[in-house]
Regions:
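The feature encodes the CheY-like receiver
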Residues: 72, 102
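Short, glycine/charged-rich "phosphate-handling" switch motifs in NTP-dependent
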Residues: 115
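Conserved phosphotransfer cores of two-component systems
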Residues: 54-60, 84-90, 112
Length: 151
């Protein structure tokens, strides 16, 4: 399906590096996706925000979390594990966005419930592939099949 989203995506960026946050914003703008962006720099605040989203009395927008593995205090794996244990976590599409090209990290996080794994590239143009991945997930991800009328 390649139609515009009728409901903006909720994108939660859990990233403590301001340069990477800037690049993610750049990618989202370049791909002209409708989105609401929430930038959070640690796992505890991200979990608090997810709890707040669950409490809101409004239709749920498709939610994508772009999660770095290396965070202060608790790492991204801990947050992924926690998100996947709560009922609201099953509605969140989690994309690991990391500098780790280690196959063991990829296998482990996908086994833990991440929906995709994106290695931060060295070249700016390659970062645009993250936008393609988000578009693919927004339009075709089975996590939101029941809400196809809203995307």
């Amino acid at each position: 399906m390649d139609t515009p989203l009728s409901t903006p995506l909720t994108i939660i960026v859990v990233e403590d590096n301001p340069v990477d946050v800037y690049l993610i914003r750049w990618v989202l703008t370049a791909h002209e996706l409708p989105y609401t962006l929430h930038v959070i720099d640690n796992a505890d605040q991200a979990m608090h925000y997810i709890d707040e989203l669950a409490q809101q009395d409004r239709p749920k927008a498709p939610t994508i979390m772009l999660l770095d593995l290396t965070l202060p205090q608790r790492d991204g794996r801990d947050l992924l594990r926690q998100v996947r244990t709560i009922p609201e976590g099953s509605d969140i599409c989690v994309v690991i966005v990391t500098s780790s090209n280690n196959p063991a990290d990829r296998r482990e996080t996908l086994r833990m419930g991440a929906d995709a794994y994106f290695v931060k590239p060295f070249h700016l143009n390659e970062f645009m592939q993250l936008g393609n991945l988000i578009k693919h997930l927004a339009f075709d991800h089975p996590r939101w099949e029941d809400s196809a009328s809203t995307v």
